[in-house]
Amino acid sequence: MTGLSINNLSMRFELPNGDHVQALQDVSLDLKAGELLSVLGPSGCGKTTLLNIVAGFLAPTSGELILNGHRITGPDAERGMVFQQGALFEWMSVRENVAFGPSMKGTPKVDKDKTVDHLLDVVGLQDFKEKAVYELSGGMQQRVALARCLANDPDVILMDEPLGALDALTREKMQSLVLKLWKETGKTIILITHSVEEALLLGERLIVMAPRPGRIHKEYRLPFADLGVDSDLREVKKHPEFGPRREEILNMIWDMEEEIMGGKEDAA
């Protein structure tokens, strides 16, 4: 695997009244295989638009995306998506949900069962495998969503606010699980989040996007994800660089939000 290259990506949405919105402008980014990237920014900066283009759900106005030497032109099995809401088949059991992708690909039953059992062990759901999804808590449903994504063995996992709806304790446990799965599988992960703390804990790299038009404003290389694989995340937060970096990024995003609100008031 050679990784993902995003080259001069722009996205323009045409509005019914003839106006347009420039959601992204000349975004370029290279991710090596196995990298974990966190993406932050104020609402409307194009984070989810960028993720949807990488997923192949949207075609960019200009620019290109190259994954493992091939141009991305639409959705395919090389990229898996985990949403804020699990997007699971609620009438199916946990096992059936995780097995869905391999079943659609015609994976032999012996191989499929081995994969599903392994992933259920990894995410701690082996004892719940016959439960219907609707019987599970939100945190458990997100564990199913992660396992289902991994069952398809994508090269890149795209995560759009996957932990945003969880309570604080469950969210911390899921953050630890994401780091564990990242290290065990070697997958490339792009994580969209509104939480500065979460972005710092989970990202080897972190980009802050600015709005109007959406673009990369600043990039950081971080030590915290590697530390969090083997340590309690609460201990990682005590790292001397963590607090100052958190404050720096929070202030940066607050300044952007104030500029947006100021622009709205001027327009009014």
From Swiss-Prot:
Q: What is this protein called?
A: Taurine import ATP-binding protein TauB
Task: List the Gene3D superfamilies.
Answer: P-loop containing nucleotide triphosphate hydrolases (3.40.50.300)
Q: Name one GO molecular function term.
A: ATP binding
Q: What coarse category fits the chief subcellular location reported for this protein?
A: membrane
Q: Which family would the database say this protein is a member of?
A: Belongs to the ABC transporter superfamily. Taurine importer (TC 3.A.1.17.1) family.
Write out the entry's keywords from A to Z.
Answer: ATP-binding, Cell inner membrane, Cell membrane, Membrane, Nucleotide-binding, Translocase, Transport
The organism sits in which domain of life?
Bacteria
Q: What is the lineage of its organism?
A: Bacteria, Pseudomonadati, Pseudomonadota, Alphaproteobacteria, Rhodobacterales
Q: Catalyzes what?
A: taurine(out) + ATP + H2O = taurine(in) + ADP + phosphate + H(+)
In Pfam terms, one family for this protein is ABC_tran
